[in-house]
């Protein structure tokens, strides 16, 4: 639903603060624990949830998210179960936007039309599919938009002025600026470079620009949130899950609470990065 996403960003703009966008891996380390994490995210201050779709060959992800995907797959997580996670979450939360993030192969195998219908029924608001370039928009992007599901595109430091309009052409919901080249979990980029990149993208679109890669602490969220419409945190959350598990990768009574504690701190940082509210 594009309306839920648009409403959330409008509310945040009125409040004069950036969104805190939190990523976690669906099914890590098991279904019930990941549902508990998902429910805890908004309560801890997350404004938008990115729901990871586990995949056996996640080429753009760093070691932490790769391991999270492996734990989820080992626990029996499937794309169908990841959609069910969203549906179960929606039973008690109809306000927080959910963006599914992952790779095209599981969606292709599931069936594009069936996936989009099931995603819509589960309350999914947007998709980020990292290995589908704009040249393949007819595969999933255009059908998703026709169904009313946002298709969020990634921009990087190497997305130049010539390429940017192509990247943004069918993008909706928000633009996800990957603040450095490489895999997820890298170090925090230079804030001045991030600010310049956000302004450059905004010259080409009216969509919100959210920045990810390298954000791990409340201070990071505050610094990056000072120039962006949203701050995306993924690896830090996935690591928090991992460190709470038993030696054999099972959840403990502390797993959900450990994530909630981290997100509360990140939320505090993001909320202190005051943006200029709309007149």
Swiss-Prot record:
CDD domains: Tryptophan_synthase_alpha. Its EC number is 4.2.1.20. It comes from Rhizobium etli (strain ATCC 51251 / DSM 11541 / JCM 21823 / NBRC 15573 / CFN 42). The alpha subunit is responsible for the aldol cleavage of indoleglycerol phosphate to indole and glyceraldehyde 3-phosphate. Pathway: Amino-acid biosynthesis; L-tryptophan biosynthesis; L-tryptophan from chorismate: step 5/5. GO terms for cellular component: cytosol. This is Tryptophan synthase alpha chain. Belongs to the TrpA family. Keywords: Amino-acid biosynthesis, Aromatic amino acid biosynthesis, Lyase, Tryptophan biosynthesis. The gene is trpA. It catalyses: (1S,2R)-1-C-(indol-3-yl)glycerol 3-phosphate + L-serine = D-glyceraldehyde 3-phosphate + L-tryptophan + H2O. Tetramer of two alpha and two beta chains. GO terms for molecular function: tryptophan synthase activity. It is an enzyme of class 4 (lyase).
């Amino acid at each position: 639903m594009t309306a839920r996403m648009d409403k959330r960003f409008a509310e945040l703009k009125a409040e004069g603060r950036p969104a805190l966008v939190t990523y976690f891996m669906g099914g890590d380390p098991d279904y019930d624990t990941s549902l508990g994490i998902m429910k805890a995210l908004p309560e801890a201050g997350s404004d938008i949830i990115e729901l990871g779709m586990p995949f056996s060959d996640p080429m753009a992800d760093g070691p932490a998210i790769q391991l999270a995907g492996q734990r989820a797959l080992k626990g029996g997580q499937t794309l169908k179960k990841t959609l069910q996670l969203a549906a179960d979450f929606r039973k008690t939360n109809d306000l927080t936007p959910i963006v599914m993030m992952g790779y095209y192969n599981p969606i292709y195998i599931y069936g594009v039309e069936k996936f989009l219908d099931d995603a819509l029924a589960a309350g999914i608001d947007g998709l980020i599919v990292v290995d589908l370039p704009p040249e393949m928009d007819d595969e999933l992007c255009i059908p998703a938009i026709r169904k009313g599901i946002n298709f969020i595109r990634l921009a990087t430091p190497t997305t130049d002025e010539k390429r940017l309009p192509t990247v943004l052409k069918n993008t909706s919901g928000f633009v996800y600026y990957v603040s450095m080249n490489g895999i997820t979990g890298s170090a925090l980029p230079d804030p001045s470079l991030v600010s310049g990149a956000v302004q450059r993208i905004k010259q080409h679109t009216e969509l919100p620009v959210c920045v990810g890669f390298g954000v791990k602490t409340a201070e990071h969220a505050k610094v990056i949130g000072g120039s962006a419409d949203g701050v995306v945190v993924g690896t830090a959350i996935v690591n928090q899950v991992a460190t709470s598990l038993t030696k054999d990768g099972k959840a403990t009574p502390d797993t959900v609470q450990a994530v909630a504690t981290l997100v509360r701190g990140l939320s505090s940082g993001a909320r202190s990065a005051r943006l200029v509210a709309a007149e």
